[in-house]
Every structure is written in structure tokens, then in C-alpha cells.
Curated annotation (Swiss-Prot):
The keyword ATP-binding applies. ATP-dependent specificity component of the Clp protease. It directs the protease to specific substrates. Can perform chaperone functions in the absence of ClpP. CDD domains: RecA-like_ClpX. This is ATP-dependent Clp protease ATP-binding subunit ClpX. HAMAP family: ClpX. It comes from Methylobacterium sp. (strain 4-46). PANTHER family: ATP-DEPENDENT CLP PROTEASE ATP-BINDING SUBUNIT CLPX-LIKE, MITOCHONDRIAL, ATP-DEPENDENT CLP PROTEASE ATP-BINDING SUBUNIT CLPX-LIKE, MITOCHONDRIAL-RELATED. GO terms for cellular component: HslUV protease complex.
Length: 423
């Protein structure tokens, strides 16, 4: 047992791992024959967390199977089965391609870059963020809206590879095996059907710049960003084996898809076309490369994204599940915040249904759920730190509709705050 010698041996205890005394640390936890301090506990937790980042179960070849990848995605993303399958297979094949390249050189396995198309708030970015947690290859996310052609104000396309290098601690070998997710890819569509009107430095120009790194080239990347440090040496990164996943909401694409195949006619004999009342995600399922060309992507760019995955609109049931089921569900997050005030937060089933309906009405998808909950809980979160006797807060449907205040339960009696009456 770790104790001090001499007169202090009975009074001063020491951590058995780092040797610090009980006076040097906040807590010292006693076991049957040893002691451990809070700092060593934190260190152990950090080690475990680092290990769990790449905790995918490996198959006999060291490659996670699509089902194993899908299982982890299911923990954080509700629905979107087709998109999950596409991503799981793509990442699995990416691992296999890297393993194959190291052992064989008789057949070259080409990569299949992916384009994710889905309405806003359907989970495109969340899928990519979840992949980043679980992969043991370097992963980075980039925003297409910040990119411009080289020589113009904004970020160069090479900055994407620089971010991947940073994610791999500037290990070029590891960076060349990484995965890049480019968000808001629809925002770099050509601004006009006429390709020659003006210089389009943030649209078609960026698509042209992305072509080579997506297909495979040796990119010269400045380690500290090229525009601020022009004299530095460049790192050479081969992008041939880097998998690119692009995602975008493609607002307006549904009209292009719906119009395809519908003949136009005028006059008294014209056929009256019924408006397409299908949901956006349902229309996206019928997308063809020609629709993307009409939207403003150039043919060469579409050709480098051979795998198309569409995401569905989130319905009421899916939004309710998103509120409650994932590991980082919004309801769980707010309940944890309230727990810090020693208060239980409870949502009635009807209240969650109304929150989901509001998000659908706003057409913001899952992204709008947080703002709705924030507005509902704002006054409560403002008042709560000053109310010592509150043990539970109940959110009912009237609260979501703005007709009543949340119900505060004080000790063993229920009481409104200030009164559960119509506003």
C-alpha cells in the first residue's frame, strides 16, 4: 500500500500509479491494496477513448465489414438505410483496395467516389461526421462554398489535401489513404447554362480545379497554407487512393427531375400536367446524370462521382426517433444539462410529436429540431439555476404550442411556473 514513511505514514496516502500524495490531487480512490488519484483516472479514460475511436470489429483481413460499419452508423443516424448501405460498402471497398494495393499489382482497383443527394436536414453531414469517429484512416471534411480558383480570394482546392495532411499529423503516407467529405457541393454549380458568359471563379472554376485531385494526381501542398507563406517547401501528395464523398441539398433539382419526360404543349388541345406532389427525397430517387448536368455540374465532374446515393425526407416518426434514440439525441442532451442542476426533464409523447410536426412545417429537417427545443426551454433554462426546490420539469403539448408554461414539480408537490394557464 502506498503510504509515506515515518510519522506521516498513517496520515498521508499516495497514488500507487503516479506517486502523488493525497494533498497534491483532488481525489484519491482507495482499492483493497492500492490507491489511484483522479488525474490517473482521467488519463486512463483518455487512453480508452482514443482506443474506442477505431473500435470497429475487424474481420480476418483487418477490414471492417459493411454490416459492422452500418451498425455504428445506426447508433447516431436514424433512417436513411440506402445511403448507409452505399457508404458502408464504399468505405469497406476503400479498405480492401488499400490492402490489395499493398499485396498485389496485377489488377489495379479504381476508387468509386460518392455523391450524396438529399433534402436539407436529412443527415448527409451527420453521416460523414459519424464516419470520421469510427475510421482508422485519416478523414477530413471541407466546405465547397469557401473554395475558389487559384489566384482568387478564398481557399484553394489544395487546402482540402492540407486538411487531410493535418488529420494525419503530416504523415504523407497515411494521408494518401484517407477519405475526404466535401459538403455543400451543389453550391459550386455553374451559374448559367451558357458556359462562356463571365469568369465563374466559385462555381465551374472550382469544379475544374477539383477534377484532377478527385481522379488522382500528385498535388503540391504547402504545409502552412500557400498564400501566406509563398517561400515554403511543398509536400507532394498522391491523391489516387483518396476516396472523395460529396454531399449537397441540390435545392431545385427536384423540379428538373419532375420536368424530365413531361412533354410540353400549348393551345386548346394541351394536356394539363398535374403538379408533382411527391416529397423531395422521393423525387431524388429518380435522379439521372443528365439532371445533374442541367443543375449546373459539368460532365467531367459528374463522371468522377460514379456512385449516387439519395437520402429521404424525414417524416414525423423518424424525427421523433431522432429526438430520443441516437447516442447524442437532443432530448438526452437537454436532460443531461438539466441533470447538472439536479432536475429531471421529461417530455410527454404528444409534445415530441408536435416538435416533429413543427420541424416538418419549417422544412428544415432534423437540423431545425434544436432551435425548436431551444425556444421551448429558453425561459426554463434561464430561471432554473435560481430555483433550488425544483426536482422535475415536464414539457407537455401545450408548452410546445405556446399556450402554457412548463410544469415545475417542487419536492413532493406539483406546481406551475408560474401557472400552467393559456398565454
Amino acid at each position: 500500500m502506498s503510504k509515506a514513511g515515518g510519522n506521516d505514514s498513517k496520515s498521508t496516502l499516495y497514488c500507487s500509479f503516479c506517486g502523488k500524495s493525497q494533498h497534491e490531487v483532488r481525489k484519491l480512490i482507495a482499492g483493497p491494496t492500492v490507491f489511484i488519484c483522479d488525474e490517473c483516472v482521467e488519463l486512463c479514460m483518455d487512453i480508452i477513448r482514443e482506443e474506442s475511436k477505431s473500435s470497429l470489429v475487424k474481420s480476418r483481413d483487418g477490414v471492417p465489414t459493411p454490416k459492422e460499419i452500418r451498425r455504428v452508423l445506426d447508433d447516431y443516424v436514424i433512417g436513411q438505410d440506402f445511403a448507409k448501405k452505399v457508404l458502408s460498402v464504399a468505405v469497406h471497398n476503400h479498405y480492401k483496395r488499400l490492402a490489395h494495393a499493398a499485396k498485389h499489382n496485377d489488377v489495379e482497383l479504381a476508387k468509386s467516389n460518392i455523391l450524396l443527394i438529399g433534402p436539407t436536414g436529412s443527415g448527409k453531414t451527420l453521416l460523414a461526421q459519424t464516419l470520421a469517429r469510427i475510421l482508422d484512416v485519416p478523414f477530413t471534411m471541407a466546405d465547397a462554398t469557401t473554395l475558389t480558383e487559384a489566384g482568387y480570394v478564398g481557399e484553394d482546392v489544395e487546402n482540402i489535401i492540407l486538411k487531410l495532411l493535418q488529420a494525419s499529423d503530416y504523415n504523407v503516407e497515411r494521408a494518401q489513404r484517407g477519405i475526404v467529405y466535401i459538403d455543400e457541393i451543389d453550391k459550386i454549380s455553374r451559374k448559367s447554362d451558357n458556359p462562356s458568359i463571365t469568369r465563374d471563379v466559385s462555381g465551374e472554376g472550382v469544379q475544374q480545379a477539383l477534377l484532377k485531385i478527385m481522379e488522382g494526381t500528385v498535388a503540391s501542398v504547402p504545409p502552412q497554407g500557400g498564400r501566406k507563406h509563398p517561400q515554403q517547401e511543398f509536400l507532394q501528395v498522391d491523391t489516387t487512393n483518396i476516396l472523395f464523398i460529396c454531399g449537397g441539398a441540390f435545392a431545385g433539382l427536384e423540379r428538373i427531375i419532375s420536368a424530365r419526360g413531361k412533354g410540353t404543349s400549348i393551345g386548346f388541345g394541351a394536356t394539363v400536367q398535374a403538379p408533382d406532389d411527391r416529397r423531395t427525397g422521393e423525387i431524388f430517387r429518380a435522379v439521372e446524370p443528365e439532371d445533374l448536368l442541367k443543375f449546373g455540374l459539368i460532365p467531367e465532374f459528374v463522371g468522377r462521382l460514379p456512385v449516387l446515393a439519395t437520402l429521404e425526407d424525414l417524416d414525423e416518426t423518424a424525427l421523433k426517433r431522432i429526438l430520443q434514440e441516437p447516442k447524442n439525441a437532443l432530448v438526452k442532451q437537454y436532460q443531461r444539462l438539466f441533470e447538472m442542476e439536479n432536475v429531471d426533464l421529461t417530455f410527454q409523447e404528444e409534445a415530441l410529436t408536435l416538435v416533429a410536426r413543427k420541424a416538418i412545417e419549417r422544412k428544415t429537417g432534423a437540423r431545425g429540431l434544436r432551435s425548436i427545443l431551444e425556444s421551448i426551454l429558453l425561459e426554463t433554462m434561464y430561471d432554473l439555476p435560481g430555483l433550488d426546490s425544483v426536482e422535475q420539469v415536464v414539457i407537455g403539448p401545450e408548452v410546445v404550442e405556446g399556450k402554457a408554461r412548463p410544469l415545475y414539480i417542487h419536492g413532493d408537490r406539483a406546481k406551475d411556473a408560474p401557472a400552467s394557464v393559456s398565454a
